[in-house]
Amino acid sequence: MAMMVENSYGGYGGGGGERIQLMVEGQGKAVPAPFLTKTYQLVDDPATDHVVSWGDDDTTFVVWRPPEFARDLLPNYFKHNNFSSFVRQLNTYGFRKIVPDRWEFANEFFKRGEKHLLCEIHRRKTSQMIPQQHSPFMSHHHAPPQIPFSGGSFFPLPPPRVTTPEEDHYWCDDSPPSRPRVIPQQIDTAAQVTALSEDNERLRRSNTVLMSELAHMKKLYNDIIYFVQNHVKPVAPSNNSSYLSSFLQKQQQQQPPTLDYYNTATVNATNLNALNSSPPTSQSSITVLEDDHTNHHDQSNMRKTKLFGVSLPSSKKRSHHFSDQTSKTRLVLDQSDLALNLMTASTR
């Protein structure tokens, strides 16, 4: 005795409908759902191992390339090419995602080389699709391999398995697992933020210390200025230089005049004439000889010269340069001029 029940339902994400065929033979042995059979064939095909293949322990299968899987393989086995719809159908049959970084699914009855275990996999039913309180044919002592059968004309579907919100949230193909995924970039970013926060706090403390030191130095500077302005008397300028100059001037006035015999200073013609003027009582005489360019003595004058009552001797070394470059003046002294006439200094 065999019976077939056709159940069409809307696929998730526009994936189309699925026909569930259940055959009962003898004592009610079930045949796997076509979705499970097709999925097993798709995974077990060695020609597509680069796209989808069994896992390391042959209890899981991995979709290595979801875009190629949806574009090239799904249309060959199903009526759609939507990978999200395929994942949702896996969730309804109790498949779970193993690792978060790749599409690896597992079911305790989906194993390599054990295709007969597919009969133990049943599709989940939500409470909205088949409410439990409105199912008169549901058996309370249901065993997985047995399908309850009553003497009526309707063959009931396997009892629904109500899923909890936590399971629904976990088995969404786009949702992460219960444990949050930790990305290394996020860890590095968090470490950088922590380091920057520590540096910022250290700089803030250093800035506070520097500001306090600056305020202390400003206060010290103001105190020094106040002390100088209020407690230090200004120092009068020293008059030692003026006192020294006046002292030297007085000393020069008190010293008697001296005669420098070896004075080599140049005496102009007017000063020489003033010195040559002498009173008639003077007995000394000076003869002035002028040599022109013809080297002839034209004139010689005997004159007496005194300075403060003292006769001035003359020497041949003493010479006077006039503006006329062609003539020179010479002093000639007689033997009578070598005598010194002493005179009494006048009282002041």
UniProtKB/Swiss-Prot annotation:
Q: Which GO terms describe its biological process?
A: asymmetric cell division
Q: How is it modified after translation?
A: Exhibits temperature-dependent phosphorylation.
Q: Where in the cell is it found?
A: Cytoplasm; Nucleus
* UniProt motif Nuclear export signal: location: 338-343
Molecular-function annotations in GO: DNA-binding transcription factor activity; sequence-specific DNA binding
Region annotation (Hydrophobic repeat HR-A/B) maps to 187-232
The alphabetical list of record keywords is: Cytoplasm, DNA-binding, Nucleus, Phosphoprotein, Stress response, Transcription, Transcription regulation
Annotated GO CC locations: cytoplasm; nucleus
Q: Motif Bipartite nuclear localization signal, which positions? A: 303-318
Pfam families xrefs: HSF_DNA-bind
Question: PROSITE patterns in the record, alphabetically?
Answer: HSF_DOMAIN
Residue range(s) of DNA binding per entry: 32-126
Give the domain of life. Eukaryota
Family according to the record:
Belongs to the HSF family. Class B subfamily.
Q: What does this protein do?
A: Transcriptional regulator that specifically binds DNA sequence 5'-AGAAnnTTCT-3' known as heat shock promoter elements (HSE).
Self-association state and partner proteins as the record states: Homotrimer.
Q: What is known of its domains?
A: The hydrophobic-rich region (HR-A/B) corresponds to the oligomerization domain.
Please give the name of this protein: Heat stress transcription factor B-4
Organism field = Arabidopsis thaliana
Question: Which gene specifies this protein's sequence?
Answer: HSFB4
